[in-house]
């Protein structure tokens, strides 16, 4: 596989956008420090009003302290964040599905699940959980589940009866290694196990929130989510009169729904309020559509070697894409608009905790594969 390490590549690209760091503002509280071994004249200990000059001096001092603290605080490092999260997610995925009887189906599941990939969905899930006050353990099972379902969708999407692709993540597709029959079953098994894994392996979360997360995930991949988008996409292939509204329906459901669910699951399992969950839902819907717009752009501007999958396939099968409807430059402008709108939804959250989601949105916008 070409991926020099996809995580390193991803981080390097993101760091070019951010100059490797993101800064935040921080606010320090005031501490009262008692004077030890000091004798105070009672007459001088009487409360007296502050003069305007004294108040101004104190305010200036505290402002200087805040500025100094902000300058000395360690900035967010996206490369470190991505590397650490990817290691954690890959370890959890490896441990979740082990090879047992029947060997061939578990090997096929692991082949595609552990074949690399950017792990965007798991990272979004974990980042959203931590943003609302949860910890990684609360959402790790869900993060693995969304990656299992994403992998299922790729296995099925690559089948001869669908997109008929031979290359995925720089390697032969699942059906090229294990045959169409086993590939279908491997995808089915990943889908079923994803829900089992959330229920059995989620730690430190109330049952009601786990049930809510399961319902959210199920909805995102059924006839109100991924399946709806996939069916609409199939019906529109080869149709020269597909409208922009129809194209948006396809991608909001086919691509954005699972990305949206990844973020919402993290927010639910992290203990987020209804208001926080809905703000993050809007954020995720924007970056989900952004992901597809960028995908369409890359399909016509990059090679198969650069993408790790077959390039130019959309043009060959006459599939409607954003560059086809809008033109390449307008598609790029639309991507930038979606990125801006996504970030607006994060206003009001703690800036330090929101930094990973801001960085992930920028990665999606500026990625090269």
From Swiss-Prot:
Task: Kindly list the positions annotated as binding Mg(2+) 1.
Answer: 157, 163
The enzyme class is transferase
Q: Which GO terms describe its molecular function?
A: (2E,6E)-farnesyl diphosphate synthase activity; dimethylallyltranstransferase activity; geranylgeranyl diphosphate synthase activity; metal ion binding
User: What species is this protein from?
Assistant: Capsicum annuum (Capsicum pepper)
* UniProt-annotated binding residues for Mg(2+) 2: 157, 163
The record's Gene3D superfamilies line, in alphabetical order, gives:
Farnesyl Diphosphate Synthase (1.10.600.10)
Question: Taxonomically, what lineage is the organism?
Answer: Eukaryota, Viridiplantae, Streptophyta, Embryophyta, Tracheophyta
Q: Where does dimethylallyl diphosphate bind?
A: 168, 254-255, 292, 309, 319
Q: Where does isopentenyl diphosphate bind?
A: 118, 121, 150, 169
Name of the protein in question: Geranylgeranyl pyrophosphate synthase, chloroplastic
Alphabetical keyword list = Carotenoid biosynthesis, Chloroplast, Isoprene biosynthesis, Magnesium, Metal-binding, Plastid, Transferase, Transit peptide
What CDD domains does the annotation carry? Trans_IPPS_HT
Q: Which GO terms describe its cellular component?
A: chloroplast; plastid
Tell me the compartments it is located in. Answer: Plastid, Chloroplast
């Amino acid at each position: 596989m070409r991926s020099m390490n996809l995580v390193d590549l991803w981080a390097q690209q993101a760091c070019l956008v951010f100059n490797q760091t993101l800064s935040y503002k921080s606010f320090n509280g005031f501490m009262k420090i008692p004077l030890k071994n000091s004798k105070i004249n009672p007459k001088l200990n009487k409360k007296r009003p502050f003069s305007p000059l004294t108040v101004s001096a104190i305010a200036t001092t505290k402002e200087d302290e805040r500025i100094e603290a902000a300058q000395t605080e360690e900035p967010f490092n996206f490369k470190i964040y991505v590397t650490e999260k990817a290691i954690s997610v890959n370890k959890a995925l490896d441990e979740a599905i082990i090879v047992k009887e029947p060997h061939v189906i578990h090997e096929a599941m692991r082949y595609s699940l552990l074949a690399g990939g950017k792990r965007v969905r798991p990272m979004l899930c974990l980042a959203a959980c931590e943003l609302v006050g949860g910890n990684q353990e609360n959402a790790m099972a869900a993060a693995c589940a969304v990656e299992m379902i994403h992998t299922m969708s790729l296995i099925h999407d690559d089948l001869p009866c669908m997109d008929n692709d031979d290359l995925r993540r720089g390697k032969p597709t699942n059906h090229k290694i294990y045959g169409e029959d086993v590939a279908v079953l491997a995808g089915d098994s990943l889908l079923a196990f994803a829900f089992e894994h959330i229920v059995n392996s989620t730690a430190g979360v109330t049952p009601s929130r786990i049930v809510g997360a399961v319902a959210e995930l199920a909805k995102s991949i059924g006839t109100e989510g991924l399946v709806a988008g996939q069916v609409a996409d199939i019906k529109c292939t080869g149709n020269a009169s597909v409208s922009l509204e129809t194209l948006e329906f396809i991608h909001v459901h086919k691509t954005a729904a699972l990305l949206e669910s990844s973020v919402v699951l993290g927010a639910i399992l992290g203990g987020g309020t209804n208001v926080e969950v809905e703000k993050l839902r809007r954020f995720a819907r924007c970056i989900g559509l952004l992901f597809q717009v960028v995908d369409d752009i890359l399909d016509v501007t990059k090679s198969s070697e650069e993408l790790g999958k077959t390039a130019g396939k959309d043009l060959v099968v006459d599939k409607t894409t954003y560059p086809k409807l809008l033109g390449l430059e307008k598609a790029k402008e639309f991507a930038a608009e979606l990125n801006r709108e996504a970030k607006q939804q994060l206003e009001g959250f703690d800036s330090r905790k929101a930094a990973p989601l801001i960085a992930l949105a920028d990665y999606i916008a500026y990625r090269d594969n």
